Curated annotation (Swiss-Prot):
Organism: Geobacillus sp. (strain WCH70)
HAMAP family tied to this protein: NDH1_NuoH
Keyword Coiled coil in record: no
GO cellular component, one term: plasma membrane
Protein name per Swiss-Prot or TrEMBL: NADH-quinone oxidoreductase subunit H
């Protein structure tokens, strides 16, 4: 879509097009974050036998997250005296920017994608890891022992689970023969990869939850151990940036899971009269629901359990999946 607009427009309007589409993407993502948080709180409330937000914005609490955002914007912006001020200020931006950048290459339908590059999957993996730099910088700059411990946990966790996540998607790349996300979706026109690569899907999904720092892998911000972890000294809109990056990554990871394993916008058999955008939204919503379900259901792992799961279980299983996939490809295709 982006290329068509740019090719049909005079060169002086390219900047305006980029800016306008960037704003549209930003507002779409912020709308998801706003009501994604509300949906998460309502689902968690339902699973725990509570009502959830039900006061601000009517019976369903539709304006609860809006009120929370306004509260954060009006809060005092404090910086600890002992903090490294420039790095303390930059860290939330460093954490948030990559989360927003990865969305540009995700195809939501066959006609709606901001940037179709040949190595979209590689781009996503490379850029998504940059957020950890902001997390580590924020923990270090805070000059707080709890923040530093949380930052070190985040770095160790990213290294431990980025590798199984990358290795797990290599099976998909072997089957498709491409790193282009559109090609990966088109290759699933007849059969989704969740049925062909179930082991890869399980490894990818577990590693994705760890990458998102969500329960049961939320050690970097474990409230019962580290108060709030790496962002313990942050408040107001700077804290909101860290929160936004987490939920934007939730959006991106759910979309990537849909693209890699659930056929993207391709419909279920005999239901192809339903638009592709509806199918993508439905699959995406199911993935988000499962991520919320994980948060409510599982207890937090210990640090040693988290490391062992990543290096002793997920990584070997992902390697085995590559070997089996390559062997089958060589013998039968």
């Amino acid at each position: 879509m982006m290329e068509q607009l740019l090719n049909s427009a005079p060169s002086w309007t390219n900047l305006v097009i980029f800016f306008g589409l960037g704003l549209a993407l930003l507002f779409a993502v912020l709308a998801f974050v706003t009501y994604g948080i509300l949906a998460e709180r309502k689902v968690m409330g339902f699973m725990q036998g509570r009502y959830g937000p039900n006061q601000v914005g009517g019976r369903w609490g539709l304006l609860q997250t809006v009120a929370d955002v306004l509260k954060l914007l009006l809060k005092e912006d404090t910086i600890p005296k002992a903090a490294d001020k420039p790095l303390f200020i930059l860290a939330p931006i460093i954490a948030f920017a990559p989360a927003f950048m990865v969305l540009a290459t995700l195809p939501f339908t066959d006609a709606f994608q901001f940037a179709d590059i040949g190595v979209g999957l590689l781009y996503y993996i490379a850029v998504s890891g940059l957020t950890t730099i902001g997390v580590v910088a924020g923990g270090w700059a805070s000059n707080n022992k709890y923040a530093l411990i949380g930052a070190m946990r985040a770095a160790a966790q990213m290294i431990s689970y980025e590798i199984p996540l990358v290795v797990s998607v290599l099976g998909v790349v072997l089957l498709t023969g491409s790193l282009n996300l559109n090609d990966i979706v088109e290759a699933q026109k007849d059969v989704w990869y969740i049925f062909i690569q179930p082991i890869a899907f399980i490894v990818f999904f577990i590693a994705a939850v760890a990458e998102l720092n969500r329960t049961p892998f939320d050690l970097p911000e474990a409230e019962s151990e580290l108060v709030a972890g790496f962002h313990v000294e942050y408040s107001g809109f700077r804290w909101a940036f860290f929160m936004l990056s987490e939920y934007v990554y939730l959006f991106a990871m759910a979309a990537l899971t849909t693209i890699l394993f659930l056929g993207g916008w391709h419909p279920v058999m005999f239901l192809d009269f339903i638009p592709g955008a509806v199918w993508f939204a439905l699959k995406f919503s199911i993935v988000v629901f499962v991520l919320i379900w994980f948060r409510v259901t599982f207890p937090r792992l210990r640090a040693d359990q988290l490391m062992e799961l990543g290096w002793k279980v997920l990584f070997p299983v992902a390697l085995l999946n590559i070997f089996v996939t390559a062997l089958i490809q060589e013998l039968f295709f």
